[in-house]
Structure formats: C-alpha cells, structure tokens
Amino acid sequence: MSEQITSAKATAKTVRTSPRKARLVIDLIRGKSVADAISILKFTPNKSAGIIEKVLMSAVANAENNFDLDVESLVVSEAFVNEGPTMKRFRPRAKGSASPINKRTSHITVVVTEK
C-alpha cells in the first residue's frame, strides 16, 4: 500500500542574506496558512522577506504540481533558516591594516502541509 503524501518542501541554498535577519522574518510565517504567510511577506519591508516569499511559492508549486495537493488548504508546517558558508573579505583601514568582513549566507527551507 502506498502512503498518501501530504507535504511538500522547497529549499534555497547559499542565499546572500544573514541567517540572523532571515530568522526574524521566518518566525512570522511559521504555522500560518499559505495565503496569510504570503500577505505577511508582501508587506514586510525586509530583503529576506522577498527571498522567503520565493521559497514559499516554490513549495506551493511543488505541492500542486508534484503531489496534487489542494493549494487552498496548505499550511506552513516547518520553516527554518540554517547558516550557509561564510565569505570572508577584508576592508582596508588606516596605516596599512585591514579589518575582516564576514559576508554571511543562509540555507532557507519551507515545508507546507495539507490541513
């Protein structure tokens, strides 16, 4: 007997946004319905909100096209941000010295489930 799949997942890897800032936005949508989550993200004035919205729309598209789930009844069951690789750069400073700059990246994952 085959089990009915009720969830779909989407991941964006090595996204050029800080995990700490992305977590603030992802906490807003966890547990919400997809329609609510999209409206929250549209009106959140944050760079990572646009990226998270794309990942959410990708998860919804995966649910619809790959698993034939009903889009109206989808809920954001899991949403988390992990730390990606850090790009290390140097900023020139006075007297020939340099300061390190860490350009952080994130791995963003969103899982949607049918109610």
Curated annotation (Swiss-Prot):
GO terms for cellular component: cytosolic large ribosomal subunit. Transmembrane segments: none annotated. One of its GO terms (molecular function) is rRNA binding. GO terms for biological process: translation. It comes from the Bacteria. It holds the Pfam family Ribosomal_L22. InterPro entries: Ribosomal_uL22, Ribosomal_uL22_bac/chlpt-type, Ribosomal_uL22_bac/org-type, Ribosomal_uL22_CS, Ribosomal_uL22_sf. Keywords: Ribonucleoprotein, Ribosomal protein, RNA-binding, rRNA-binding. Disulfide bonds: none annotated. Part of the 50S ribosomal subunit. Belongs to the universal ribosomal protein uL22 family. This is Large ribosomal subunit protein uL22.
